[in-house]
């Protein structure tokens, strides 16, 4: 039997969602550039869905927003939660209209896996645990990046960058035996070194989301 030249199959992919909360594109650009400066490898080239639930202005210039994002090497695959006029703009721009939450049919949740790294993560290295948690038995050095769609556990010193809940999981946590991170992020909310030091009284810690803000808790010795 001859193999068909194409096949259409169902599948699921993890996409990051960029929430636009302001109609001021200059403000959006400024805040976006600050995030890109912190972790460019994490954002650049990654497929994104733009959530427009906070935009109710029917005259909003979606084309200008698309140009702003693509000029920074962000890959926009579609929009979600937009009013009708913006959905029509999206169609003319070749963007998909993506349904989410109650609008979409429920998909079976993939089993969460754990990626185990039994060595130090050195400067310039990046480790990504897709659809699961990341456990590092060792030190994450300055200039190294550890990323997980789930939680991150460091049984050693965290000196580099740790980004948990990369696909939007707000229940993810970052735990480190010694917390000296350059940056920590959970579901897009981030702290730099100064924030960590200002909110922590011990070296070890568990960072999690409390509402829309990060918080750190001491670990029992």
UniProtKB/Swiss-Prot annotation:
For this UniProt record, the keywords arranged alphabetically read as follows: Cell cycle, Cell division, Septation
Q: Which domain of life is it from?
A: Bacteria
Give me the disulphide-bonded residues. Answer: none
Classification via InterPro entries: CAP/MinC_C, MinC, MinC_C_sf, MinC_N, Septum_form_inhib_MinC_C
Q: Which GO terms describe its biological process?
A: cell morphogenesis; division septum assembly; regulation of cell division; regulation of cell septum assembly
One Pfam match, given by its short name, reads MinC_N
Q: What does this protein do?
A: Cell division inhibitor that blocks the formation of polar Z ring septums. Rapidly oscillates between the poles of the cell to destabilize FtsZ filaments that have formed before they mature into polar Z rings. Prevents FtsZ polymerization.
The UniProt entry's sequence similarity note says: Belongs to the MinC family.
How is this protein organized at the quaternary level? Interacts with MinD and FtsZ.
| Protein known as | Probable septum site-determining protein MinC
Instruction: Name its species.
Output: Shewanella sediminis (strain HAW-EB3)
Gene name as annotated: minC
């Amino acid at each position: 039997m001859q193999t068909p030249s194409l096949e259409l199959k169902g599948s699921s992919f993890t996409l990051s969602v960029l929430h636009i909360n302001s109609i001021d594109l200059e403000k959006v650009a400024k805040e976006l550039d600050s995030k890109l400066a912190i972790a460019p490898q994490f954002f650049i080239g990654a497929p994104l869905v733009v959530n427009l639930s906070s935009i109710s202005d029917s005259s909003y210039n979606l084309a200008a927003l698309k140009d702003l994002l693509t000029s920074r090497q962000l890959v926009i695959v579609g929009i979600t939660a937009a009013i009708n006029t913006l959905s029509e703009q999206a169609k003319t721009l070749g963007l998909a209209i993506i349904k989410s939450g109650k609008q979409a049919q429920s998909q079976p949740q993939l089993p969460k896996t754990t990626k185990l790294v039994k060595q130090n993560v050195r400067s310039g290295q990046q480790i990504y645990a897709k659809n699961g948690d990341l456990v590092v038995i060792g030190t994450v050095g300055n200039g190294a990046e550890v990323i997980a769609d789930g939680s991150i556990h460091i049984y050693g010193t965290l000196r580099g960058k740790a980004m948990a809940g990369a696909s939007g999981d707000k229940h993810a946590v970052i735990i480190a035996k010694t917390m000296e991170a350059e940056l920590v992020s959970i579901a897009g909310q981030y702290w730099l070194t100064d924030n960590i030091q200002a909110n922590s009284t011990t070296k070890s810690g568990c960072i999690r989301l409390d509402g829309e803000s990060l918080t750190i808790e001491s670990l029992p010795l």
